[in-house]
Amino acid sequence: MSGSASELVRWDAARLSEALRAGEVSAEEVTRAHLDRIDAVDGPTSGAGETGVHAFLHVDHEGALARARQIDADRAAGAELGPLAGVPIGVKDVLTTKGLPTTAGSRMLQGWVPPYDATVVRELHAAGLVVLGKTNMDEFAMGSTTEHSAYGVTRNPWDPTRIPGGSGGGSAAALAAFEAPLTIGSDTGGSIRQPAAVTGTVGVKPTYGAVSRYGLIALASSLDQAGPCARTVLDTALLHAVIAGHDPYDSTSIPAAVPDVVGAARLGATGDLAGVRVGVVRELSGEGYEPGVLARFEESLTELRAAGAEVVELSLPNIVHALAAYYLILPSEASSNLAKFDGMRYGLRVVPEGEHVTAEAVMRATRAAGFGDEAKRRIILGTYALSAGYYDAYYGSAQKVRTLVQRDFDAAFGSVDVLVSPTAPTVAYRLGEKLDDPLAMYAGDVATIPANLAGIPGMSLPCGLSEGLPVGLQVLAPQQADDRLYRVGAALEARLNDKWGGPLLAQVPTWQGASA
């Protein structure tokens, strides 16, 4: 074994992969190190008490170790294995996993164990990755803080009194706490990118349709997209290459070749962006953004120019209406998708007392007990927006705005290769700070939502600290040009790492139970 357990959990996936292929370390050793790390820092039983990260909802100790031993045996037998074989990974609890609980962070699916794997999970198994368990999330991906999970909040490893972002805060926090080198998230309006921003990690929302949604529990079907999360741009690219591709089980899947995202990341790591035109979105870098966030963003623009990129400012005039349109489209689609959860076939079932209990009574009792406040709020909003007499005024109008936003992006990409902005207007705020002000919470996704409306790919990567907390920079590219994200992201990462003297996450403070 070439590294101690405390060292192994800090290795990135690319380094782990090289060590595994060279026989310097076994998959079982790597997996056990990460399971021990989870046991040490993740929950009340870890010794970390109430300040545990709580990134995971379910940890599959036995299954992960058995899988790792099988990978080691296959490697010893000379079997041909994928580049990430033996590398551990966490999966957001919105993707179905055969034999493992899948709750989507809701009581409504409490105790449900799916009989099948999502296509993304199937691809992970085929590539030889070791699934450690399922990560925490806001209920049915409705939230920006992971405070709306029915199974407890997740804490930000940079400061356990602060949010890790959402809805996929568990996937991001697991990376920042060195509980896993890779995770899978899903992004409906920023649920991969916003948590990445506030935890100092990297997250990518691929082009809509580039990664299969089969087995992804739907929130808003025209917006949802699974994607890769990691601590480095290259690791994110390696995972992206595993999960992307056409899937006949998903009618929205794109039947097109996957861009060479790994090659783009390696090219970008040279730090050379000569000939690349970068657009700064005027509407996403001004009013409403914290001064520290804007300062780190401006410093990043300086680094992009130093790398040889041409940086120009441009306007997307209709993007200011994206947030309002999104919060009509999303609850409308969610109210339809969540109608299937009624306590009849799977998950929670609440039977009222009485001799003659009807199916309707069971549905009412189950949904009242099973859905949390935020889910109920959005179901009611969506049902209203779709109701007779209001459909055209609300949902129909929102879809027209969506088209205008898409056209703005099309026009912008006619003159630049990528667009950049801060990922989030603030750094991570205190747990509970915005629970009673949902509109303020929703505004945290103002920069990420437009990409979902347009179906374009987006990346968040760390660009510095403000008040000791991570700041994220967002890179956007045209549809099916996901490779551009990785070239620009890797170039900026390389320059910033040189400036900082190492990755930003090397500066994450230690706290109770979380030293590595």
From Swiss-Prot:
Keyword Nucleotide-binding: yes
One example GO MF annotation: ATP binding
EC annotation from Swiss-Prot or TrEMBL: 6.3.5.7
Gene Ontology annotations of biological process type: translation
Pfam families recorded: Amidase
Signal peptide (UniProt feature, chain positions): none
PROSITE patterns reported for this sequence: AMIDASES
Alphabetized UniProt keyword annotations: ATP-binding, Ligase, Nucleotide-binding, Protein biosynthesis
SUPFAM superfamilies per the UniProt record, alphabetical: Amidase signature (AS) enzymes
GO cellular component, one term: glutamyl-tRNA(Gln) amidotransferase complex
InterPro entries assigned: Amidase, Amidase_CS, Amidase_dom, AS_sf, GatA
Catalytic activity: L-glutamyl-tRNA(Gln) + L-glutamine + ATP + H2O = L-glutaminyl-tRNA(Gln) + L-glutamate + ADP + phosphate + H(+)
Residue positions of the active site: 92 (charge relay system), 167 (charge relay system), 191 (acyl-ester intermediate)
EC category name: ligase
Top-rank lineage group of the source organism: Bacteria
Family: Belongs to the amidase family. GatA subfamily.
HAMAP family, per database record: GatA (MF_00120)
Subunit organization: Heterotrimer of A, B and C subunits.
Entry function: Allows the formation of correctly charged Gln-tRNA(Gln) through the transamidation of misacylated Glu-tRNA(Gln) in organisms which lack glutaminyl-tRNA synthetase. The reaction takes place in the presence of glutamine and ATP through an activated gamma-phospho-Glu-tRNA(Gln).
Name assigned to this protein: Glutamyl-tRNA(Gln) amidotransferase subunit A
Organism name: Kineococcus radiotolerans (strain ATCC BAA-149 / DSM 14245 / SRS30216)
Gene behind this protein: gatA
